């Protein structure tokens, strides 16, 4: 196995990766709450952990990748009521949309995708364990709360003391709680809302307990990697630790991974600021692979600044890689080990995709200048390494075709007209056709065997 190092949010440093079971990695990632279309922040979570999953598999590990679906939540209940739509119909509609979005981004499905509503019985059982251990209590209002004072290490993931958390957080006053930071495990049923019977009366689970239960059920009391967006680090993941460690017998996750935020033109993405984009919004103007490439150009832990200019730059970069392969051999070839080793070293260094992509550009530059005898090995290496990032697997002519632009057949017809004009020595017409295509972002490359075209 490789010398993989991960940045562990819990220790706040890079650590060598050692799976609990040799050659087998167990990874849980917090998924979507399905009440709306996925936004580009969700897209980053999808792309980041899909890329991590791809690298783990390519490194020889068997991977069990679990990503949950939250299909019961206050937001879901509220949206279903607003739409006058059954909750299950609403959630299934947005689950289907989520799957379409991740497929467009080139993401492979997780190994297991549990839904919260499928594990309510297990949630009730775990809450019962926490009550029995005096980590939770039944409040006067019928809710069940977790007592943060019962867990001495609460705040260790956020690296903040309990007193500091109380002082720094804006917490709504709730007289039913023993402590303002206590969080709900079970919500007493309200009229018109879904509910399940429990020893504490009818109700439904809180958000935090859902992930503790689903990860435990699928991966056991102790697993390798838990991931999600930086916004989940506190309180969600902090609360998961507090819930899981008492019932799992100690440390339940070895490595905590968090991806950074997406900003819009250097401002935080927010519906109130009017700079909120769904994946579908962006896919209207850019291919999914362009969005994926854009996100992988930044290290997963850092912020990404989304703008049209940045997407256009990413598109041009991806086109350069595809263009290098345009006339390269599509069969044969052997891996160039020095480039593979550098690529793998970058990915083993906490999934450093910017450095890995730099290796791809070096190969593309070599390929543009390569003699025929060398081209097959370079092209094979470029395609093989790019595929580990989920890149360069599509058809460039389809990928970069502008909305409303000429189809491939129409471009070929224009090239044929140009060839006929050149044969008739009508060079003015031939030049005019080339200029027309160039204005549409289509470049022509003439050779002894004919004319190739590609998007600039």
Swiss-Prot record:
Its EC number is 6.1.1.16. Disulfide bonds: none annotated. Binds 1 zinc ion per subunit. SUPFAM superfamilies: Anticodon-binding domain of a subclass of class I aminoacyl-tRNA synthetases, Nucleotidylyl transferase. It is found in: Cytoplasm. It comes from the Bacteria. It catalyses: tRNA(Cys) + L-cysteine + ATP = L-cysteinyl-tRNA(Cys) + AMP + diphosphate. One of its GO terms (molecular function) is zinc ion binding. One of its GO terms (biological process) is cysteinyl-tRNA aminoacylation. Its cofactor is Zn(2+). It is an enzyme of class 6 (ligase). One of its GO terms (cellular component) is cytosol. A motif ('HIGH' region) lies at residues 32-42. ATP binds at residue 271. A motif ('KMSKS' region) lies at residues 268-272. Zn(2+) binds at residues 30, 211, 236, 240. Keywords: Aminoacyl-tRNA synthetase, ATP-binding, Cytoplasm, Ligase, Metal-binding, Nucleotide-binding, Protein biosynthesis, Zinc. Monomer. Belongs to the class-I aminoacyl-tRNA synthetase family. This is Cysteine--tRNA ligase. The lineage of its organism: Bacteria, Pseudomonadati, Pseudomonadota, Gammaproteobacteria, Cardiobacteriales.
